[in-house]
Amino acid sequence: MAKKLRVGILFGGRSGEHEVSLLSAASVLNAIDRSKFDVTPIGITKQGQWLAAADASNLLEGDQSAVARRLRAGDPDTTPGAKLLHDGIPTLFPPEPPPAPHAKAGIQLAPAASETRLDGQSTRLDGKSLDVLFPVLHGTFGEDGTIQGLFELAGIAYVGSGVLGSSAGMDKDVMKRLFANARLPIVRHVTLLRADWEKSPRKSIAQIEAALKYPVFVKPANLGSSVGISKAHNRKELGPALTLASRYDRKLVIEAGVGGKKRKARELEVAVLGNDSPQASVVGEIIPGKEFYDYEAKYLSEGSIPVIPAKLTKAQTKQVREMAVAAFKACDLSGLARVDFLMEPDGKHRIFLNEVNTMPGFTQISMYPKLWQATGVPYKDLITRLIELALERHAEKTRTTYTRDE
């Protein structure tokens, strides 16, 4: 019998999408092929503490009260600082070190035990050796390149895009610049800093109104799952929308609306899978139950209707799938991404690239697994393929020389 690969599933995190991550991770943990993988759940609280074993399970189930009580009591069996161990990595302490040298608090990296291999093929967490990490983390400190940088420093194989792709895929402003450079069609937009909005609100609104017509969509540049997004139909609604978005990021993106007064833009989605030769799924469409596909519509409501495959012409389908792969490559992504589009409901039916999501939702109602299911890749096989892609990408990286030969 072949030896099982040891996979660490990370979830939670310091993000406005913490709860979404818990839902996604629960689905992955339920569906992953246990005949091939030995799975270790790894939780990260909203405060950034790392949890393993029963504490990770409590976090996943939403029962953080038990975790919190044990943390406050200093239970020696609790692992809030679940050590991510690997040879050659120095100890990294949180901004405020624990009061005692051996106190368990915050996140800590430390050299691993001597049996840990030096070739970057394995890491250790809380005494367990792991071959690959699957960060089912959405939003800040999970999908934005920060934790990917940690994995890169430790030489650990992991699912999803690298530091560059993850950070570019999280920042809607940078993402749009890359799309424009690749000559991919995007909607008109304005980028505004929170500092400028707070310093000169009138000037900021004038800048937006000079460039765009109402309605507009106001978004935090670095957040997903439609958190903090508002649709503003006029100046009266624009101010509160900017204030809301500024709670979640220092940079805001304001986009022109697509569609007419009576008909909304069509929202199309494509799932992309692969590394250097990515493949696109069938095209899907979301028909929101609300005015637009916001956080509640995505995760809390049953009003939105997914249509798979989307009702498009052959030419439109081909165009959208090709644009999805082009966007994936433009942002230097790997592993997986969901690519979102807006299509004019009338007139020329122009199609605009909206954004990429480097770690799309994996809940039971999420489009990414549904799109691949419709393309012929079952959920369990999809998870297996993502882990294989992570190992392939890691093996490719080991071919790179990082030091100068004397």
Predicted ranges, named:
Residues 2-5, 11-15, 34, 183, ...:
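ATP-dependent carboxylate activation and anion-phosphoryl transfer catalytic cores
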Residues 26-27, 243, 325:
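Solvent-exposed alpha-helix faces
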Residues 181-220:
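Rossmann-like NAD(P)H-binding beta-loop-alpha module
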Residues 230-322, 347-352:
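Phosphate-binding site of ATP-dependent enzymes
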Residues 39, 157-158, 186, 216, ...:
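Hydrophobic beta-strand scaffold residues
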